[in-house]
Amino acid sequence: MPSPQQRSGSFRKVFVKLPSGKSTIHYERRKDNIARCGMCKKPLNGVKNNYTYKYSKTEKRPERVYGGYLCHKCLESLIKMTIRGIS
């Protein structure tokens, strides 16, 4: 029977064929989804999406206002709207 950590949904089952001909089940972490912009839903550049616990805080997302939440185009339009007073 699998150990309790392998019974969680965060691990996926991978069937692996061994050199002896038997097939066994290996458990591996599921891949995270790609980070997307909050306004236009396009994938964000410069944001790592897998194994984020291995990276430092500055490596995980860009160092700018709304970095990791908005893409550069949406941020540009948001800044323009706030300066012009449009809500």
From Swiss-Prot:
One Gene Ontology term, aspect cellular component: ribonucleoprotein complex
- The organism is Sulfolobus acidocaldarius (strain ATCC 33909 / DSM 639 / JCM 8929 / NBRC 15157 / NCIMB 11770)
Q: Which HAMAP family match?
A: Ribosomal_eL34
Give the record's family classification: Belongs to the eukaryotic ribosomal protein eL34 family.
GO BP annotation list: translation
Q: Which UniProt keywords apply?
A: Ribonucleoprotein, Ribosomal protein
Protein name (database record):
Large ribosomal subunit protein eL34
* One GO molecular-function entry: structural constituent of ribosome
Q: Does the keyword Nucleotide-binding apply?
A: no
- Which domain of life, per UniProt? Archaea
A Pfam family this protein belongs to? Ribosomal_L34e
